[in-house]
Amino acid sequence: MTDVDLAFDEQEYIPAVAQDADSGDVLMLAYVTEEALRKTRETGEAHYYSRSRDELWHKGGTSGHTQAVKEVRVDCDGDALLYIVDQTGGACHTGYESCFHRTVDGETVGEQVFDPDDVY
């Protein structure tokens, strides 16, 4: 499937960070299975694996807030991926541009770009 060895964990997941191709902002962290990575590469749109729902997940399949994957990179240990994406709409299901929209002190630092009640 790839030209490099990937180190999936014992549950057959590998973490994937999504990064905005234009701004460089980190948008989200999710998990990928071999099937999710294959679908991402086949379609050019981000696919992840929802551990809570135990199913393959096409990012934006419900909301329309898709991620067009420009490149997939792997870290030096082969145990993490970086999806460099063109994000349509917000990446976070809470309506924010990034899932990393809060500090550990509780301060909101991100921008809410849609109302989740209108989408889900």
Swiss-Prot record:
Which reaction(s) does the protein catalyse, per the Swiss-Prot or TrEMBL entry? 1-(5-phospho-beta-D-ribosyl)-5'-AMP + H2O = 1-(5-phospho-beta-D-ribosyl)-5-[(5-phospho-beta-D-ribosylamino)methylideneamino]imidazole-4-carboxamide
Question: What does the Swiss-Prot or TrEMBL cofactor note state?
Answer: Binds 1 Mg(2+) ion per subunit. Binds 1 zinc ion per subunit.
Family stated for the protein in its record: Belongs to the PRA-CH family.
Name the pathway it acts in.
Amino-acid biosynthesis; L-histidine biosynthesis; L-histidine from 5-phospho-alpha-D-ribose 1-diphosphate: step 3/9
Q: What biological function has been recorded for the protein in this entry? A: Catalyzes the hydrolysis of the adenine ring of phosphoribosyl-AMP.
Q: Name one GO biological process term.
A: L-histidine biosynthetic process
Q: Which GO terms describe its cellular component?
A: cytoplasm
Identify the keywords attached in UniProt to this record, alphabetized.
Amino-acid biosynthesis, Cytoplasm, Histidine biosynthesis, Hydrolase, Magnesium, Metal-binding, Zinc
Q: What is its main location?
A: cytoplasm
Q: Name one Pfam family in it.
A: PRA-CH
Give binding positions for Zn(2+).
C76, C92, C99
Summarize the subunit comment. Answer: Homodimer.
Q: What is this protein's name?
A: Phosphoribosyl-AMP cyclohydrolase
* Keyword Aminoacyl-tRNA synthetase attached: no
What highest taxon heads this organism's lineage?
Answer: Archaea
Its EC number is 3.5.4.19
Q: Where in the cell is it found?
A: Cytoplasm
Q: Which residues bind Mg(2+)?
A: D75, D77, D79
Cofactor(s) needed, names only, are: Mg(2+); Zn(2+)
Q: Which cysteines are joined by disulfide bonds?
A: none
A single MF term (Gene Ontology): phosphoribosyl-AMP cyclohydrolase activity
